[in-house]
Amino acid sequence: MRRAVLEILEERIIHNVKEIHRFSGKRIIAVVKANAYGIGVREVSRILEGLEEVDAFAVACTQEGVELRECGIKKKILILGGILEEDVKLLEEYDLTPVISDPEHLKVLKDRNIKFHVKYDTGMGRLGFTNEIIKDPRVEGVMSHFSSPADRNFSKLQIKRFEEILKNYEKVKYIHLESSAGLIYRVPFTTHVRVGLAIYGEKPLKDYPLEVKPALRLRARLISVKELPENYPVSYGRTYITKRKTKLGVVAFGYADGLMKTLSNRSFLIFEGRKVPIIGNITMDMTMVDLSGTEARTGDWVYIVNEERSFTPLARDAGTIPYEIMCNLSRRVERLVIKKR
């Protein structure tokens, strides 16, 4: 039985990539780390590989880069999350491009003929050099990262700092700063944009100017539908007591599949376009919903995410960010690419 399916809408992925390219005027470094934000790196990267707007991919570690190569990706692959001595052999064998953000990373490369990008910390307080200029013919690109793109004043300060640093680098092929949210700044001196979330149609900011479309549908099966009497408890801890006779649906999707427990008693799923409230505590493998007034039957599909409600508002209900919910989608969820017609 298919318990849960994440549908990846190829046509919308392609639309979103073209919209990002149209808006920015730049080619894209597609961020597909963490299994493409939980969506499915093999499925997503194979769509993106064939798009001329996508110039390169970015992942967190060498192991993720190796996985991309093994599923047939030929384009450039950046390793964003640092390297150690043990990574060098894989960098060479799989033609991976490291991002250098610490003096020790440079020592690891020694005299190896491996091109790399240099990362600068312009206000993120995480990875990156601050003022050090790397004079090395192997430098192929320079990058930085916004810490809070919604804060326009601080983001403009980061842009200014990055521009000053770039005065020390001439003729580098790749200069990248803008993320999905950072696209709004249209930084004039970058060559590429480094984007993940917007590819899937999630809007990282209110009043987002790009016309991206939700490209994901997450659905799960009803494995039981039954009537409960008034004043009857639902799920662990009896945090919900029925207020009337209730048609209870048990959905084969729980926190082990990626639905955060914080959504218990405070959000909804979608059945045939109708919002059905989550009632009681979400459990490891199941979620209970109130199906009263519907014709739902065991075996029907209920949507967690679709064109009506993307991961972003779902995350808002959970008190988190869409990245966290997406990255928590487990391997029990089947990934299915819906091909462009």
UniProtKB/Swiss-Prot annotation:
List residues modified as N6-(pyridoxal phosphate)lysine. K33
Entry GO MF terms:
alanine racemase activity; pyridoxal phosphate binding
PROSITE patterns linked to this entry: ALANINE_RACEMASE (PS00395)
Report if keyword Isomerase is assigned.
yes
Residue positions binding substrate: R126, M284
Might you give the EC number(s) for this enzyme?
A: 5.1.1.1
Top EC group: isomerase
Which cofactors go with this protein?
pyridoxal 5'-phosphate
Report keywords, A-Z: Isomerase, Pyridoxal phosphate
Q: What else is known?
A: Strong thermostability.
Q: What is this protein called?
A: Alanine racemase
Please tell me the species this chain comes from: Aquifex pyrophilus
Lineage, please? Bacteria, Pseudomonadati, Aquificota, Aquificia, Aquificales
